[in-house]
Amino acid sequence: MRKLIHIFDKLPSWSASVVVLIVILVLTLDSNPVQIDLPNIVGIDKLVHGIMFGGLAMSICLDIQRRNWSALIGIGSVIVAIVISSVVGVTVEMLQYWIANGRTYETYDIVADVVGAFVLGFMARILLKKYGVE
């Protein structure tokens, strides 16, 4: 697992976050998104939102950690990652509300974005503590 985490070390420190952010923006703002047939499970859309914005929080945590592998990122850095990811989630929902592109605003999407960012942000710290810090 350590080798997998360190494979990104040769890339710029912000690269993982930018890639995840671009994917999220395409999936959430494109008027003709990739058509994925999700199973007809109640709440699957909210789960996907949580995973997307939790993934953004995780990638921000990884990018912060990559600056110094000798010390685990602090709780403050995790909170910053959660806040950034949550702000992006709220912004995306507001853009969906204001831009007539066939997308709709949902308050529960924002809740799912924030919960996903919180859970996976702290999970990133746990995983980095176990596998990443030297």
Predicted segments with their positions:
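Bulky hydrophobic segments
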Residues: M1-Y108, V114-E134
